[in-house]
């Protein structure tokens, strides 16, 4: 462990996923804390003004639902938790919409499940939507879709969701705001000798031994889930900060490089992590052959693959599948995530994007494989 806090990580981060827990957005379980949410939105607006992109992952739906339904304690029955989530999600979305608009920002509600991110096509659709929202200057507010998936309530948590979203959008950093000042060497509520861990590697096995214990009765995650979330986020190159959410101007100060909380540093660079994931960990579902001009652009300019440069399409693949890209000699030169299924790819092969709507009945991405989802293999 080191106490040399690498503040440059957050200072230089341009795309940030911020996760706030139930204890920070509710009045001790008695509905949403309007003042607290307003403060988060004010800080987010300052980050956006500083040319940063921010995605919120917010807990609080079940707690708000409990308040609206008049329940004093968190229920244990799945259907009651689902009902509370459904009722509370209305208030949560309305509160963020109001407070973000007061700060000059648009908002969008996005409800996800782990299944959405496990399916390649839905993963790519969710990614495209979120990146479009960020490009439009809108702040996505994400929560798990607890109402429709039983095991999300039983075993899921928004710390994990925050990490998955960081992977999804290739965020530079994940900020987990909680009711603790960070990770301590032991539980500070039980051990007076416990000290704050200022910085560590996200994959350090000693971290899990330090974490442990459960959270409050309002949320589902304890410190261990935050450590595991940081480890998951590091898979796509995102470092994680775990910090006390009641720290004044926490988000703004972190973005300025202040040493707050615990920094868990990713050991893999963002681009390297994604390229490795595409190149090594997904089974090829098909291939496309490209002409000499497309080959030159892919190799020499790092361009996206456009359908007009394709000569043939082989195999049966879906949107989001990994496909090989071959030159005219049949040699694989790259691979990447397909934006179009094989049936559609055959229709737009050798065609400019201006004809896609006429050929397919809709207009989507102009690229067959976007350069962000493409890795050269030769």
Curated annotation (Swiss-Prot):
Sequence positions that bind substrate: 59, 146, 158
Coiled coil: none
GO biological process, alphabetically ordered: L-proline biosynthetic process
InterPro entries: AceGlu_kinase-like_sf, Asp/Glu/Uridylate_kinase, G5K_ProB, Glu/AcGlu_kinase, Glu_5kinase, Glu_5kinase/COase_Synthase, Glutamate_5-kinase_CS, PUA
Keyword Kinase among record annotations: yes
Domain PUA: 285-363
Main subcellular localisation: cytoplasm
Subcellular location per the Swiss-Prot or TrEMBL entry: Cytoplasm
Gene Ontology terms for molecular function: ATP binding; glutamate 5-kinase activity; RNA binding
Binding site for ATP: 19, 178-179
CDD domains attached to this UniProt entry: AAK_G5K_ProB, PUA_G5K
Substrates-to-products reaction catalysed: L-glutamate + ATP = L-glutamyl 5-phosphate + ADP
Keyword field contains Repeat: no
Biological or metabolic pathway of the protein: Amino-acid biosynthesis; L-proline biosynthesis; L-glutamate 5-semialdehyde from L-glutamate: step 1/2
Family recorded in the similarity comment: Belongs to the glutamate 5-kinase family.
PANTHER family: GLUTAMATE 5-KINASE, ISOPENTENYL PHOSPHATE KINASE
Function, in words: Catalyzes the transfer of a phosphate group to glutamate to form L-glutamate 5-phosphate.
Protein name: Glutamate 5-kinase
Protein source organism: Albidiferax ferrireducens (strain ATCC BAA-621 / DSM 15236 / T118)
């Amino acid at each position: 462990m080191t106490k040399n806090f690498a503040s440059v990580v957050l200072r230089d981060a341009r795309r940030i996923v911020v996760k706030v827990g139930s204890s920070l957005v509710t009045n001790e379980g008695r509905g949403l804390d309007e003042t607290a949410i307003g403060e988060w939105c004010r800080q987010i607006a300052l980050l956006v003004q500083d040319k940063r992109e921010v995605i919120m992952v917010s807990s609080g739906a079940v707690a708000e639902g409990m308040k609206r339904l008049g329940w004093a304690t968190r229920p244990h029955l799945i259907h009651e938790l689902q009902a509370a989530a459904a009722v509370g999600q209305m208030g949560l979305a309305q509160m963020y919409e109001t407070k973000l608009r007061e700060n000059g920002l648009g908002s969008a509600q996005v409800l996800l499940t782990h299944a959405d991110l496990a399916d390649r096509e839905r993963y790519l659709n969710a990614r495209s939507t979120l990146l479009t929202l960020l490009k439009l200057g809108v702040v996505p507010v994400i929560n798990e879709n607890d109402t429709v998936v039983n095991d999300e309530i039983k075993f899921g948590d928004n710390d994990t969701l925050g990490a998955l979203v960081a992977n999804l959008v290739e965020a530079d950093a994940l900020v987990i705001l909680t009711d603790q000042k960070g990770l301590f060497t032991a539980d500070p509520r039980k051990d007076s000798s416990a000290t704050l861990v200022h910085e560590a590697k996200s994959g350090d096995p000693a971290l899990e031994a330090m974490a442990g214990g459960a959270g409050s009765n309002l949320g589902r995650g304890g410190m261990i889930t935050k450590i595991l979330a940081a480890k998951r986020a590091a898979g796509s190159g995102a470092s994680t900060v775990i910090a006390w959410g009641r720290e004044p101007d926490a988000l703004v100060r972190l973005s300025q490089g202040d040493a707050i909380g615990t920094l868990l540093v990713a050991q893999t660079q963002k681009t390297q992590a994604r390229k490795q994931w595409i190149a090594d960990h997904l089974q090829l579902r098909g291939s496309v052959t490209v002409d000499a001009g497309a080959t030159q652009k892919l190799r020499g300019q790092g361009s996206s693959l456009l359908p007009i440069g394709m000569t043939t399409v082989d195999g049966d693949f879906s949107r989001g599948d990994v496909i090989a890209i071959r030159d005219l000699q049949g040699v694989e030169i790259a691979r990447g995530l397909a934006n179009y299924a094989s049936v559609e790819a055959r229709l737009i092969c050798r065609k400019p994007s201006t004809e896609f709507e006429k050929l397919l009945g809709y207009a989507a991405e102009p690229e067959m494989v976007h350069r962000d989802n493409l890795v050269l293999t030769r």
